[in-house]
Amino acid sequence: MKLQDTTLLRQQAYIDGRWCDADSGQTLAVNDPASGELLGHVPLMGSAEAVRAIEAAEAALADWRGRTAKERASILRRWFELLLEHEQDLARLMTREQGKPLHEALGEIRYAASFVEWFAEEGKRVYGDVIPSPANDKRLLVIKQGIGVCTAITPWNFPAAMITRKVAPALAAGCTIVVKPANETPFSALALVELAERAGIPAGVFSVVTGDAPAIGAQFTGHPSVRKLSFTGSTPVGRLLMGQCAETIKKVSLELGGNAPFIVFDDADIEAAVEGALIAKYRNAGQTCVCVNRFYVHDSVYERFAQRFVERVRALAVGPGDTEGTQIGPLISDKAVAKVRSLIDDATDKGASVLLGGKAHALGGQFFEPTVLTDIAPGMELLQEEIFGPVAALVRFTTDEQVIELANATQYGLAAYFYSRDLARVFRVAERLEYGMVGINTGLISNEVAPFGGVKQSGLGREGSKYGIEDYLEIKYLCLAV
């Protein structure tokens, strides 16, 4: 792997300001999903190492929360600058371990850095309240304080941004945090904490442990010193973690599964809708929680949309992420390929037609053809399962009422998208869609200033925006006799 700064490729975990191996000496292999090439190893840590990281976070808490918001912001600002200074190396590292095209990886690094910059400033704006007292001899105040020791479990699909979106608000609020990155993509996390150390974040304030997810997760959810857990991943795992946190009444933030609908109304700009559909479906090979699962297209424009959409999808270039011109990289694992294949087989067995793709790519390995299916009917698994692959399912509809009902017919409620030029319809539909985020005439909705999160079984809490820091704060009421 060609990096300008080779020290960014760390093959040890980071606990209490020290780079360390697992107590057992065991390691996990990290492979390039595009080629299968071995990239390196990281420690296979477990319960004992997780406890040490949590204890270090507890020991570092008093000093870190005792610093002014401005002091913490200065360090976070330096971390932000270092992320941008090393963006090319960080992007190359991400592409090799995660598989996404290099231009997408670079975009993610900049996106990740934006959360650090944003929350460095938001930490200075954690305002309290003065409450008009019902008694002349009392003064009533509200202050906000960091919740304490936090833990975070992050996914492989956005291995940098999902870390900074959790770590930056925690540190800005005066909390300390321990992160467990996905075993598929630990090198991005370790590079981030390397730069955080260079920025001056003190020992114990931000640690990264790699290895046995159940063993580490059990300490993250069960250790009495941990006051908050943040998790991005599947709904079943989120449900499990939430249950484990209940024993010690921890605060939880959960960004879980999605089943995003994309609605094209009869008055939509079809070219714009196709462009938005490509972004919302095929970014990261369809492996994002806000990727579209279900395309609902009005009957009057269905053929026109489908034809143009297939033309554009056919032109997408599939290949290794570090190959120039690549638009779709590999899926993360053989298991992911098998899941996509299974969903397509289920749909075609039940009457769906393949307009494009539908099988493993000629490149072999974990590459899969960009796929478009039509004749989708109720009962097909891909209408209810999160696909997490480059498969688009097209469904006809005729009325607004019908499509709103179809769009909401899921346990999930993360993101939804629709295209319409009727302003009254825009407000009417947006308000009735049961989702935490709605993209209107756009397929790209996420940024650092907007609240990211879902409803129903897509999670709890919001990340990013002015609301993102609130999940790391406790409200304290002060009553002063005068």
Model-derived regions, located:
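Glycine-rich loop-to-alpha-helix module at the N-terminal edge of alpha/beta enzyme cores
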Residues: 37-126, 137
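Hydrophobic face of amphipathic alpha-helices that form TPR/SEL1-like repeat modules
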Residues: 1-34
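Conserved C-terminal structural/oligomerization subdomain of aldehyde/semialdehyde dehydrogenase
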Residues: 35-41, 226, 263, 317, ...
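Structural signal for hydrophobic packing residues in well-ordered secondary-structure cores
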Residues: 61, 65, 80-87, 91, ...
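Residue-level signal for inorganic ion chemistry
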Residues: 36, 72, 94, 116, ...
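Short, well-ordered beta-strand elements within core beta-sheets of diverse protein domains
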Residues: 38-45, 60-66, 152, 262-265, ...
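Rossmann-like NAD(P) dinucleotide-binding subdomain of oxidoreductase/dehydrogenase enzymes
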Residues: 128-272, 397
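ALDH superfamily catalytic-core signature
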Residues: 236-373, 377, 440
